[in-house]
Design a protein with these regions (language model features):
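Rossmann-like dinucleotide-binding domain for NAD(H)/NADP(H)
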Residues: 216, 220-313, 322-324, 357, ...
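An N-terminal-biased, well-structured beta-alpha scaffold segment characteristic
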Residues: 1-79, 211-213, 217, 234, ...
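A conserved regulatory-domain signal marking ACT and ACT-like small-molecule sensing domains
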Residues: 304-387
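Phosphate-binding beta-alpha-beta segment of Rossmann-like dinucleotide-binding domains, i.e.
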Residues: 79-137, 298-303
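Oxidoreductase and adenylate-handling cofactor-binding alpha/beta cores
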Residues: 87-106, 155-159, 284-298, 334-338, ...
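Rossmann-like adenosine-cofactor binding region
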Residues: 42-44, 167-259, 274
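Hydrophobic/small residue at the entry helix of a nucleotide-binding pocket
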Residues: 146
Length: 387
């Protein structure tokens, strides 16, 4: 029986199902894996028995992924499962930042006791005249799960859509509308845009990527939208641009001491993925990833280990080795197997950055001494006997 510890409220209705062969436990010390959402695990003392962590959501900033990699713990996330929810909210922000909807509604509430409100509302509406999205130029930074959907939706709205993503995958390139005009540099994307929306992860090369230089390239009174990660935007630069009128509006999903005091903003409570459908989709994907890893050793959508799959574990034995990406690891592994006269049916090795993953099937179960010898290889983080 495999044991799962859940952290956070995974779904709105509380239903989380792994199926036969799994049970939920009350403490992480009892668990084989953790299913979580947004709790910050930095500083968390992870029990040695934890083999994997799956986050129900994109990203992994709340998890010390490299630290866990060195402990042989695979961290999964669920990219794309909440992408439609984020896309819809971004589209809503495009409308709200262009039509004075909230300001108009506030006027109505503030004047609810006015006996002549019908007449006065007609007079007041000219203060909330906005602009249409059709024909306006929008730049989309990042054409992944969310960005590609936003770009395609903006095409459907009749906008002039430009996209920037030097690392776009083949999968997302195929689904991107031919009407989206891809550009080669961030500067070319920003130049003359009426709207700019950001959809990239937080990494060393994306932190602060939207600052004064990029804002100055936008069209006058442009709108900036950030429903990606808080750190992508230089808050001081955005604050100054709003106060100077270079930006007419800023919408983001991250309430910080700085953003909440900026003028002309819509700040939401990290609600981009806040739908029941998105929560369920994320949970389903995370559960599927955990089960495939625990049962078969396969890795998909990990943020600290490479993707790797050998299908279902059908041989007599399957072993997975999590180790540093250094020379001669395969040689050392196969030498130990040869010493035990183990016949390897299939073997695969993948690497990502500093970490690597080796998995193999054998005709017979390996001796405990062979498993122990594998564990003693320098730079070996963990050896799993899957079957």
């Amino acid at each position: 029986m495999r044991k799962i510890k859940t952290i956070d409220d995974i779904t709105k209705d509380g239903k989380v199902e792994f199926g036969e062969g799994y049970e939920f436990v009350s403490t992480a010390e009892e668990a084989d894996a953790i299913l979580m959402r947004s709790t910050d695990l930095h500083g968390y003392e992870l029990p040695e028995g934890i083999r994997a962590i799956a986050r129900c959501g994109a990203g992994g900033n709340n998890i010390p992924v490299e630290e866990y990699a060195k402990k042989g713990v695979v961290v999964f996330n669920s990219p794309g499962a909440n992408s439609n929810a984020v896309k819809e909210l971004v589209l809503g922000m495009l409308v709200l930042s262009s039509r004075g909807v909230v300001q108009s509604m506030n006027w109505v509430r503030d004047n609810a006791d006015d006996p002549e409100i019908q007449v006065d509302a007609e007079k007041a509406k000219k203060a909330f005249v906005g602009r249409e999205l059709k024909g306006k130029r929008i730049g989309v930074i990042g054409l992944g799960n969310v960005g590609s959907k936003v770009a395609n939706a903006c095409v459907d709205l009749g906008m002039d859509v430009y996209g920037y993503d030097p690392f776009i995958s083949v999968e997302h390139a195929w689904v991107l509308s031919r009407e989206v005009q891809r550009v080669g540099t961030l500067e070319d994307l920003c130049r003359g845009c009426d709207y700019l929306t950001v959809h990239v992860p937080s990494k060393a090369d994306t932190i602060g990527m939207i600052s004064t230089e990029q804002i100055n390239l936008l069209a006058p009174a442009a709108v900036l939208i950030n429903y990606a990660r808080e750190t992508i935007i230089d808050e001081d630069a955005v604050d100054a641009a709003l106060r100077e009128g270079k930006l007419s509006w800023f919408s983001c999903d991250f309430a910080t001491p700085k953003t909440v005091k900026m003028p002309n903003t819509f700040i939401t409570t990290h609600s981009g993925a806040g739908t029941g459908e998105a929560e369920a989709n994320c949970a389903d994907m995370a559960i599927s990833e955990l089960k495939d890893y625990l049962e078969n050793g396969n890795i998909a959508h990990s943020v600290n280990y490479p993707a790797c799959s050998m299908g279902k574990a059908r041989a007599a034995s399957r072993i997975a080795c999590l180790h540093a990406n250094v020379p001669n690891m395969i040689g050392q592994i196969t030498a130990i197997l040869a010493k035990d006269n183990a016949n390897v049916q299939r073997m695969t090795n993948e690497s990502a950055g500093e970490n690597a993953y080796t998995m193999f099937d054998t005709d017979e179960h390996l001796d405990s001494s062979t498993i122990e010898a594998l564990k003693q290889i320098p730079s070996m983080y963990r050896v799993r006997v899957i079957k």
